[in-house]
Amino acid sequence: WHGAIVTNPNCTTVMLAVPLAILEEQFGLEAVIVTSMQAISGAGYPGVSALDIEGNVIPFIRNEESKVESESNKILGRLVKGENVISIVPESFTVSATCTRVPVIDGHTLSISVKLKSKTSLERVVEAFQNYKPKTMVYNLPSAPKHFLRFLEEDDRPQPRLDAEEEEGMCISLGRLRPCPILDFKFISLGHNTERGAAGASILNAEMALSMGMLKEVDNR
């Protein structure tokens, strides 16, 4: 048997890891506080009872917070080659997460506060978000969006109804960046939980593996 098992992160982690990757690369991260407002489609079908979610917020999603608190560090960590084994050394910043379910069909919204290792200005953080180009762009993957992320300057954006389907649901939207009186900065991250966070991530992984020559043609005759 030839192949590999590729695991995707939690769909909420996708919307968190993207802006954290930029901040870690540019300024370094010390601490992160995140509260998620997760769409009901993330619970699958039939999902959450209409009587439970209609006009309500459910402040608990089983096993969700522990995933969000550990996965970003692992994703942004580094690979270390040992004898006959490759291990992951997670990044050292701390993540504190609260995950909630809200009456929205599609689109996870995250309220994120960060403490950076190096002091910087609001303008430089905006510039880092606006100018970021992922290294995977060189592969020109078929399912990848033209814009990996976009930064919105309107006070009331991003919103699931207006922004979750941006570029067929594959673009992550950031906005409401402002100083945080407790940490350094706070902002909103929004992405489509099933298109960018779950199914789309799986397809991108397969396309990436093919582009990197990791998939072999199999003759099943």
Question: What is the predicted role of each segment?
Answer:
Residues 1-35, 39-49:
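Glycine-/Pro-rich loop/turn segments that contact NAD(P) or position catalytic residues
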Residues 14-18, 70, 74, 172, ...:
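Short, contiguous clusters of charged residues that form electrostatic/catalytic patches at enzyme active sites
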